[in-house]
Amino acid sequence: MSKLYDLVSDYAPSGDQPTAIKQLTEGLDAGLAHQTLLGVTGSGKTFTLANVIAQAQRPAILLAPNKTLAAQLYGEMKAFFPNNAVEYFVSYYDYYQPEAYVPTTDTFIEKDSSVNAHIEQMRLSATKALLERKDAIIVASVSAIYGLGDPEAYLQMMLHIRRGDVMDQRDILRRLAELQYSRNDIAFERGQFRVRGEVIDVFPAESDQDAVRIEMFDDEIDCISVFDPLTGVVKQRDLPRFTIYPKTHYVTPRERILQAIENIKQELRERQTYLRDNNKLLEEQRISQRTQFDIEMMNELGFCSGIENYSRYLSGRAEGEPPPTLFDYLPHDGLLIIDESHVTVPQIGAMYKGDRSRKETLVEYGFRLPSALDNRPLKFEEFEALAPQTIFVSATPGNYELEKSAGEIADQVVRPTGLLDPVLEVRPVATQVDDLLSEIRIRAVKDERVLVTTLTKRMAEDLTEYLHEHDVKVRYLHSDIDTVERVEIIRDLRLGEFDVLVGINLLREGLDMPEVSLVAILDADKEGFLRSERSLIQTIGRAARNLHGKAILYADSITKSMKKAMDETERRREKQQAYNEKMGIQPQALKRNIKDIMELGDITKSRKQKVSKTVPLSKVAEPSLSYNVLTPQQLEKEITKLEAQMYKHAQDLEFELAAQKRDEIEKLRQQFIANS
């Protein structure tokens, strides 16, 4: 049998990787429903998973706990499988405010959102890959458990064109309009088509760089070509057939829309009667007005704002049935891999109840019909029923994963680089600040970095101020810092712009920082979720990528959580040391290009686009920019122009450039105030 996956890597599996790959692959072949990969920080878990997928020869969904880790995972998988369909499926909202009603203040908040067009294209590309190819790897966030269009309706709506078919040009254009493509003969963009004589050009919604040209000879399809929409260069000519996918996952055949409208009218009548009987006349008037407007829009245009609230009728599902999700697109032999499962699994369980609470208020006060409650994420038990064979991946698996795996745990403790887990020390709380200061000075001389984790925001602020007064280059990472700036701060730490990063819940799961040689955990003996066994192991793991990694736990007594975390770290060190001695391995420092890590998740950039080496890395604090003295009118114009550029960069996920523009705008605003 020919291999589906082409795994490209300069390295062969080493350390614990071969054993883990063999165990997981054999488990899949034996039909095990759940397995766990217990992989420590820096042990090459992603490479192990890539090998498992390649050997299993099956499509897979990889779930990550957030967009940052999903982007990192996507970048790594893309590098391992350049010739396969590695796709990215996360929420396409740059900004999302769901509709909500606050009864206490009688405030209705309209739904407001900003959709990232590029991520929308990648989502469509992901479902297309699952429908068309066996070698699909989809890296997704928890967005995968939210309602998506019904796969049956989606497949039914696809437009198949074949060379030699007899089709009236108007029929093709009508079908494209049904797929929600719009005609634009001037600006040709994704999700649009244009007509020039007997030639129809279509820019498929799921494509980022290819468009299709349909050439007609009277009513016959004479030629089908694929071309570059920017240059017009034909890439493939005389294709025998081509399939055009709908512009959105929420398309529905006309007959089903008409049937859905009848069902909505019936439910509206029942709801009106109920509200009148309970003397809720304002709510009855609200629901009538809103629903009738939606019905009119669906009749005329085939869709309406908030059409997902009628998904029960549009998908033909019964009340209470689970909504269609990404898992409905996954073939029956697919795999599910849950990364950082100790975080991701609880996330999946939490989504349903939060969504339900908000919608029940909307239904009660007449803003939505009760059927809107079926537009929801999956319940946890529904997710369990839908999930195919699953591999949980974590350095600290939760009780749920361990229970489900029933002893089927692949231990990946030995790192290919030979690096050991950090050396642990427990020191008294009384002198923790002064002791920490002396440790920081030792690291600063060696050009190494330090992470310090505290229990409270106040303590983190006071400690940062104290260290700053003692001439330590320190920054404080807190909850008010947005994702963009957080990434910049991490990069600046790695570049040596400062030596110490203080925080509360410091990146227990996240990006690699090989420069960090010391992790200091203050008040480690205060039991709680920030000092639980798993939290401590994850925090200690931040120093595991450094040759001289060390973790200091400041405590007056050793708690159960500390004891378990210390025992587990010691177990790992002993196993790693024994392997190194047996194989004659000398631990090697991990060198990872800083720019590579920061660009790993920049998925919106063209694969061909290269970043110039002369472009300086932007920093959290740029040197002061000089501006000529401008009039208030000129300043206003300049601010408007920069804001447009900032939003464009943010839409394209070019967060560093967006932050740069934001800082420029702030300086101009201050200048504007001073001049006014």
Curated annotation (Swiss-Prot):
It comes from the Bacteria. Residues 432-598 form the Helicase C-terminal domain. A motif (Beta-hairpin) lies at residues 92-115. Its main location: cytoplasm. Keywords: ATP-binding, Cytoplasm, DNA damage, DNA excision, DNA repair, Excision nuclease, Nucleotide-binding, SOS response. Residues 26-414 form the Helicase ATP-binding domain. Residues 636-671 form the UVR domain. Gene3D superfamilies: P-loop containing nucleotide triphosphate hydrolases (3.40.50.300), UVR domain (4.10.860.10). ATP binds at residues 39-46. It is found in: Cytoplasm. One of its GO terms (biological process) is nucleotide-excision repair. GO terms for molecular function: ATP binding; ATP hydrolysis activity; DNA binding; excinuclease ABC activity. Signal peptide: none annotated. The keyword Transcription regulation does not apply. It holds the Pfam family UvrB_inter. One of its GO terms (cellular component) is excinuclease repair complex. Belongs to the UvrB family. Forms a heterotetramer with UvrA during the search for lesions. Interacts with UvrC in an incision complex. The beta-hairpin motif is involved in DNA binding. The UvrABC repair system catalyzes the recognition and processing of DNA lesions. A damage recognition complex composed of 2 UvrA and 2 UvrB subunits scans DNA for abnormalities. Upon binding of the UvrA(2)B(2) complex to a putative damaged site, the DNA wraps around one UvrB monomer. DNA wrap is dependent on ATP binding by UvrB and probably causes local melting of the DNA helix, facilitating insertion of UvrB beta-hairpin between the DNA strands. Then UvrB probes one DNA strand for the presence of a lesion. This is UvrABC system protein B.
